[in-house]
Amino acid sequence: ADVSTAKIADLVVIKDGSEADGSTANTLRARVTDAFGNALAGQTVSVMAGNGATVAPTVITEPDGTVEISVTSQTAGISAVTASINSSSQSRDVTFIADVRTAKIAELEVIRDNAVADGSTANTLQVKVTDANGNTLAGQAVSVLAGNSATVASTVTTKPDGTVEISVTSQTAGTSTVTASINSSSLSRNVTFVADVSTAKIADLVVIQDNSVADGAMANTLRMRVTDAFGNTLGGQTVSVTADNSAMVASTVITGPDGTVEISVTSQTAGISIVTASINNSSLSRDVTFVADVRTAKIADLVVIKDGSEADGSTANTLQVRVTDAFGNALAGQTVSVLADNGATVAPTVTTQPDGTVEISVTSQTAGVSAVTATINSSTQSQNVTFIADVRTAKIADLVVIKDGSEADGSTANTLQVKVTDAFGNALAGQTVSVMAGNGATTAPTVTTQPDGTVEISVTSQTAGASTVTASINNSSLSQNVTFVADVSTAKIADLVVIKDGSEADGS
């Protein structure tokens, strides 16, 4: 055979589709002949391979003019193998495939983050699977897990470029760790879900301080929590707040990073205030209670509700005292000191009822005005009540002769003064006293007492001597004697009578 005309007669692929692992070879067979087709042994053939494949630079033909060419690569894809001798060459393509046995997670990238934690809006990652030499692997099943209660397909399958997107949803705001695994290879990335402000609602409204003093400064406190529809806390949310019963509160508050904010409520009005927190169409209400400020207890009112009682020591005049704080809130359970003058009797202290009032009963055996004073702290008020003498017990207290020894001329009078009092010695005016006089004396049958309980009784007589004058009222009476004397200014010889006659004329 003519070596001078050596040429590549054939280049045939005899093994193809090997793994691109750098050791498993694709194989070709080259045949060298002369110009007339005669096989040429011992010919050196130059070999090249494209796309990063590895091949011996020369091979030598066997006695039959053929030689096998082994080509390896770490790069999946087509490699063009060219065999040349003299000016003759031929090329054939061989294909290396990625090595599924060494499949690994080459990349895991977050391509969309901070999705809303609404259970439907997804964060997205892209995973890339390659073999040990970085060749992309299609059709590979990748296992996926997501933490913090996020939802994800348990497996995804790579596309022709070795990648696949992973969609992750959650109803839980916060960080979710997403892990992609194949064989013993895994990578993890964090994605973040944010609470859904479009569904913001008042999740909780809790009273954390209650029963503050209604002084306009001391606050009752509530803690409010705002979440989305799935219970994720929402920071930075503006919440509207109202409070009734004249309580004062900021009209809006803004939630902290944990979704909570404290609401301070003050009032000058004791009682219950309903506090309402609202966002979007969501609202919650809670009651807080303000209590009257005992430190500023004062006598707000002292009113006479019953007056003019009898001074009998048992029938009472009544007053009502009302105790409030500095802002007019009624104070229950407060001890009020009470004094009454002019001999009246009263409990030294009384205790206010739930409405801040208490009645004060005052009795007396002394008719007249009694000043009643109620005191708490440094606050006092006074009112007058009047006790009247008890006509039911009217009696003749005194009957005194103030003029005596008048002439028994039927016109010149002896005079007495009668005094009428009740059982406790209180003078009784306007009382009708019955009068009688003995020994033919003349007097008015009744007299009426003056404002001081006294009245004068005039008695005349034409009969000299003692006359017993009796004054009576109810079952009480007193008597005094007055004396009438004969009227010398009218002396006359009333009689001249011989009482002894015929005596001896003996001068003795």
Regions found by a protein language model. Name each.
Residues 1-508:
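Thr-biased low-complexity repeat/linker tracts and other Thr-enriched repetitive architectures
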